Amino acid sequence: MTPFALFDFDDTLAKGDSILPYLLYCIRRGVAPKTQLLRAVAGYIRWRLNPACASGAKKATLSFIKGRTQAEMDDLARDFFREAQSKRFFHDGFKELCRLRGEGYRILVVSASAEVYMRVLPEFLPVDDVLATPCALDAKGCYTGEVGANCKGDEKPLRIAAYLQEHGLSIDRARSRGYGDSPSDAPMLLMTDAPMLVNPKKKLLRRIPHGTQLTWR
């Protein structure tokens, strides 16, 4: 059995939501049109009215990636993290990742953020793998514009279970730790005996009152 450290990303390892900064960066780089903001706002409104539309909201926000190669978008994602997003990393979170890596934990980031940019995260933080909201590719390695199930809430344990099966691993629950900030992270955090609540929202505190509270900057 393997000791895991399971991490959310937005507001756990980095300040704020990442998809809007990513979209704005793509607009500045000329990869996405300015009108993409209108599509994103429309998608956000649909999601607020119906939370089940989360994947549709991401699809609207990221429709500009359709037809672009994975290699091209990987390079853009590296620039995004290097020039913009890395400035939002919590210093305390980075130190914790380094400590856990040194102690032999397998570190897995499980995030509702989009795979199109999250897939390069291990190049910027000491993590082993990333599970994010999937963005479909065609046979030529180009993005289709389709977005898979939103990796949030109950979807997180499902994705983790599939990952464990794929890699022939099992979680050592007693020695593993989970890190998150919102109530939607609770299903993942409760896969371990040590839920760590990072700058937690009140609903998460009510959901997991026995969790260890952490204040990260």
Regions found by a protein language model. Give the residues of each.
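Active-site neighborhood of HAD-like aspartate-dependent phosphohydrolases
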Residues: 1-50
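C-terminal cap/substrate-recognition subdomain and adjoining C-terminal extension
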Residues: 1-2, 75, 82-108, 112-217
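Electropositive phosphate-/nucleotide-binding environments in soluble metabolic enzymes
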Residues: 16, 51, 55, 67, ...
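A general alpha-helix detector
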Residues: 21-22, 56-60, 76, 80
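Short coil/turn segments at secondary-structure boundaries
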Residues: 36-40, 56, 91
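Helix-loop "lid/cap" segments that line or gate small-molecule binding pockets
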Residues: 45-49, 56-65
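Active-site phosphate/ATP/adenylate-binding loop shared across adenylate-forming ligases
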Residues: 48, 64-68, 135, 139-142
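Acidic catalytic patch
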Residues: 66-76
